[in-house]
Regions:
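A non-catalytic, amphipathic alpha-helix used as a structural packing/dimerization or gating element
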Residues: 24, 28-31, 35-38, 55, ...
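Bacterial Sec-dependent N-terminal signal peptides
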Residues: 1-21
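Sec/Tat-exported extracytoplasmic proteins
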Residues: 29-33, 40, 44-47, 68, ...
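Acidic/His- and Gly-rich active-site-bordering loop/insert found
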Residues: 19-123, 128, 132-153
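Divalent metal-coordination and catalytic microenvironments
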Residues: 43, 84, 95, 127, ...
């Protein structure tokens, strides 16, 4: 976390030759290691899922406010989204911070399988480090700007619901990034490196099927199973896997499948993700899946509706900045 904070700082304003400045910043961040690690540990313990990161967001807001940042709460109509700003004028440098956890996982911070009792969510992707290290970098950039009398605007974007909620999409729609010159972003991993690869575009949504309930033993002929429709759709989508490009990723989970085996389910729901490096390919695969769902509904005499839950374009990397980041990672 310390290394990434320092590297983010170096990429924000400092020239690659300012070795003395980098060393001073490294020492400053290291001296505050206990403070920042405590913040990260608290967010780890909170383990709040997307759009519900109330305590995690508040903690980062408080940390940045105490460091002299102006806080704008609840941006884009999202209670846990915020922007922390320091300075004015150009350039406008954005630093992203995430802090949402994943549902259905509560692994303890140990190298073997060990769940945390009483918890149903956890930080499998290290977002407790993501938000904290980004905040640390922003704070140190601010201190450097004061010391060197540098002008410019520094913004920390508190971005909720990265895990499937596409929180940043709503922030982009509100124009919160319109005047930004560059955005710095990182993610915890098992090693420190700077990549020039992009990310997968994504579209996800829920397919809901409505049938007719009936007793499965006494009057099965009167029922129309919504679960049959879900299973029929899944079979067709699984057959489709042979006929999509190798980079395509399709994931699903049945979220509703009925209440009892002896009752024909009147309602069933399946949640799908589609990913691909190209947004247009995601769209094309999604349209084929919708046709499969329509066919499943027709064949089972049920009714189908689909709700798109979210979607994102593939990230466009900046090779020049990646090289700068890589050089600074080796430096620190």
């Amino acid at each position: 976390m310390r290394i990434l904070s320092i590297a983010l700082f170096c990429c924000a304003f400092v020239t690659v030759n300012a070795q003395k400045t980098k060393q001073e910043v490294a020492e400053a961040i290291n001296s505050k290691y206990t403070t920042y690690s405590t913040i990260a540990k608290k967010i780890w313990d909170y383990a709040e899922v997307g759009y519900k990161e109330t305590k995690s967001s508040a903690l980062l807001q408080e940390t940045l406010a105490q460091a002299g940042f102006k806080i704008e709460k609840g941006v884009a109509g999202i209670p846990t989204a915020f922007i922390a700003t320091y300075g004015s004028g150009k350039p406008v440098i954005g630093i992203l911070g995430e802090y949402d956890a994943l549902p259905g996982i509560s692994q303890d911070a140990v190298p073997e399988v060990k769940t945390i009792g009483g918890k149903t969510s956890g930080h499998a992707c290290g977002h407790h480090l993501f938000g904290t290290a980004s905040a640390a970098a922003a704070i140190e950039v601010k201190h450097w700007m004061i010391a060197t009398k540098k002008s410019g605007t520094l913004r920390f974007y508190g971005t909720p619901a990265e895990e499937g909620g596409a929180g940043k999409v709503y922030m982009v729609r509100e124009g919160l990034f319109k005047d930004v010159d560059v955005v710095l972003h990182w993610h915890p991993a098992s090693l420190n490196n700077a990549e020039t690869g992009g990310t997968l575009a994504n579209k996800n949504g829920k397919f809901r099927f409505y049938g007719i309930a009936s007793h499965a033993s006494a009057s099965p002929e009167r029922g129309r199973s919504a679960l049959d429709a879900v299973e029929a759709m899944n079979v067709m989508v699984n057959m489709m896997r042979e006929h999509v490009t190798p980079e395509t990723r399709i994931h699903y989970v049945i979220t509703r499948g009925g209440e009892a085996p002896n009752v024909v389910p009147a309602f069933a729901e399946v949640y799908y993700y589609v990913r691909h490096p190209n947004r247009e390919e995601v769209k094309a695969v999604w349209e084929r899946m919708v046709k499969a769902a329509q066919g499943a509904a027709m064949g089972t005499e049920t009714r189908m509706e689909v709700e798109v839950m979210g979607g994102v374009y593939n990230m466009l990397p900046n090779e020049t900045l990646a090289k700068v980041m890589d050089k600074n990672l080796h430096t620190v």
